[in-house]
């Protein structure tokens, strides 16, 4: 199958009721191809944004997924040392203010088990490796491990934003470096409006225990909460298939404020199924 992918990471700070700031990196675009046999897929991507000299040359995303009827697995990493664009702060919106004082490195491993594997197929709506003949849903549970390192240098913010920040945050450095171990739980549903069509929705929460540094010199335990929403649509005709998926991950970090750190990924795929034997 061939694939086109667009992704972006974002951060939202909620300092208090009157001080909120949002930032997002430019979307990174790539095209690639996969060869999939049963639950294993091998592929290669070409970064279009890098070839065309886009702003996001220092961004990278790596993602490997495994699917079967009963379980799915995922290994991923996200790196951004290229900065972001501040899109809003206070009552000002639709901004385009460069901010280079950020560095983030995140990687993780996840395994998810589907409670109703005989009637519900995760692959039908998200990897297009199987067919869903009737509408059906399933609860899901899993385990998640994540290494998260994020650094914000607020002294690099534009002067007008530094003056707007609460006094204790002006010129501050916000840094977190640790690991998260969590248990995931959620529900997925595939709707089959007519033969050959599948629309899938998944929602999960991942409460996690974090051990690491958060603006201190000593490691501490803290609580983290991750949220995930996946939406997919697939069309199948004989051995041909095409579809689109949209996935969003958001992690909530609490430290005298709330930081929402997340990723948006949109993919379009098309391909042909064949039998080796």
Where are these regions (language model features)?
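Residues on the lipid-exposed face of transmembrane beta-strands in outer-membrane beta-barrel proteins
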Residues: 31-37, 62-68, 109-115, 141-145, ...
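Predominantly the C-terminal beta-signal and adjacent terminal strand-loop region
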Residues: 228-277
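Outer-membrane beta-barrel transmembrane domain signature
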Residues: 8, 148-230, 234-239, 250
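Outer-membrane pore/translocation modules
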Residues: 63-176, 247
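Outer-envelope beta-barrel architecture signal
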Residues: 29, 38-40, 60, 69-73, ...
């Amino acid at each position: 199958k061939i694939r086109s992918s667009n992704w972006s990471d974002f951060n939202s700070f909620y300092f208090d009721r009157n001080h909120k700031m949002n930032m997002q990196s430019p979307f990174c675009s790539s095209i690639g191809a996969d060869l999939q046999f049963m639950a294993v897929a091998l592929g290669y991507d070409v970064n279009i944004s890098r070839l065309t000299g886009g702003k996001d040359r220092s961004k990278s995303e790596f993602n490997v997924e495994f699917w079967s009827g009963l379980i799915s697995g995922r290994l991923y990493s996200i790196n951004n040392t290229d900065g972001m664009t501040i899109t809003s702060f206070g009552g000002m919106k639709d901004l385009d203010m460069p901010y280079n004082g950020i560095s983030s490195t995140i990687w993780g491993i996840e395994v998810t088990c589907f409670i109703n594997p005989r009637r519900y197929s995760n692959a039908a709506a998200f990897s297009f490796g199987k067919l869903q003949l009737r509408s059906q849903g399933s609860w899901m549970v899993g385990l998640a491990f994540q290494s998260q390192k994020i650094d914000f240098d607020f002294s690099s913010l534009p002067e007008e934003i530094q003056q707007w920040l609460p006094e204790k945050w002006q010129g501050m450095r916000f840094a977190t470096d640790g690991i998260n171990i969590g248990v995931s739980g959620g529900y997925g549903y595939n709707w089959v409006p007519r033969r050959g069509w599948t629309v899938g929705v998944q929602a999960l929460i991942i409460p996690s225990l974090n051990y690491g540094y958060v603006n201190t010199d000593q490691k501490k335990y803290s609580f983290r909460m991750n949220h995930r929403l996946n939406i997919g649509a697939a069309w199948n005709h004989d051995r041909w298939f095409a579809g689109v998926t949209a996935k969003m991950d958001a992690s909530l970090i609490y430290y005298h404020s709330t930081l929402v750190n997340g990723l948006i990924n949109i993919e379009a795929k098309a391909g042909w199924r064949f039998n080796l034997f």
